[in-house]
Amino acid sequence: MKRFAASTVAIVALAMASMTALAAPRTAEEIVGDYQAVANPQLDRSKTEDQAYVKQYMSERQAAELKRAALAKELFELDKGHAMLPAQMTARWRVMATGADSATVKDEIAAVIKVGGPEPLVVAARSANTMLAFRRMQAGRGTFDDAKAAVEELVANHPKDPQSPAALAQLASMADDATVRGAVEARLLAEYPDSRAAKFVKGDIRRRDGVGKPFELSFTEAITGQNVSIESLKGKVVVIDFWATWCGPCVAEMPKLKSLYADWKDKGVEFIGVSLDQPEDKGGLTALKAYVTKESLAWPQYYQGNFWDSDFSVSWGVNSIPAVFVVDADGNLHSTDARGKLEEIVPALLARRDAAAKPAN
């Protein structure tokens, strides 16, 4: 009987020890390790027209994002001063900002702003608050003034943080009134003249003001090494496609561009691809050459070599791709918003060119 009792006690003690071990909180390093181990699914670009495949891919991607979001929350509860937390919570808030989780995100952000904490985390919360305001505005549930108030709070409390000029730039882009937009842009350029956001705003202004003016572009073609310039293409309508091999929508639209090029190339139309691929040491040029060869792209490619910070695209305010410009036969910029409109714009410009070339009666 004593032996049985002793065995029972030992088993109970072992079970309790196991339960205690299971209940022990994880370390920050363990959580961060798990976070970094969650990888997005790899997109097979050859299947982007297969709707079932794309649906499955998006479902797997969302599952990965939500898993990282849960791990970010776990780290938040454990260590609000962890260096990785601001980026992880920012990603969490972006993923969960829509749908059933939007109220949770709003409450989390408000709590961080109210209670305070480490400066990087509070900056992330105020920046996320502007993101929510922008999304509400886009969805018709908020106003420009609501978004402006969120941006003003961020800038007033964190004037030296890079998120502040970025928020001002986004606010300017969402202003319907040209005077209001100009005022926000002027403030950004005055207060943050050397910021990355200022470079894009200058490009955005140039893009608006450049229509109807001569368009300048000269580069060494990435595949052949030949020199290409807009000046040498006068007399042709030129379609300029800002794109990258890593850009899903760009790749998805490439078959359509190839079809249009085949229809127009003998009618006085040239295409130019402006690549925002990664730097050469990160495989960007290799990826571009491989894709061009595989897809038999017949038009010149300008490899800029510096991803989003490439000088030419930044100088035109290109902060999303694909973006499509059109230059007319006289070498003047006709449109900076030609994506999805080429079949209207190009034939009209060809007709205008041909009409101008006819001798007067």
What spans do the regions from the language model cover?
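Short solvent-exposed coil/turn linkers within tandem alpha-helical repeat scaffolds
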Residues: 77-88, 98-103, 112-128, 137-142, ...
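A short beta-strand-turn-helix
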Residues: 219-238, 261-264
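Short, internal strand/loop/helix patches
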Residues: 222, 286-329
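Conserved redox-active cysteine motifs that mediate thiol-disulfide chemistry
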Residues: 234, 242-259, 276-280
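Thiol-/selenol-based redox modules, centered on thioredoxin-like
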Residues: 326-361
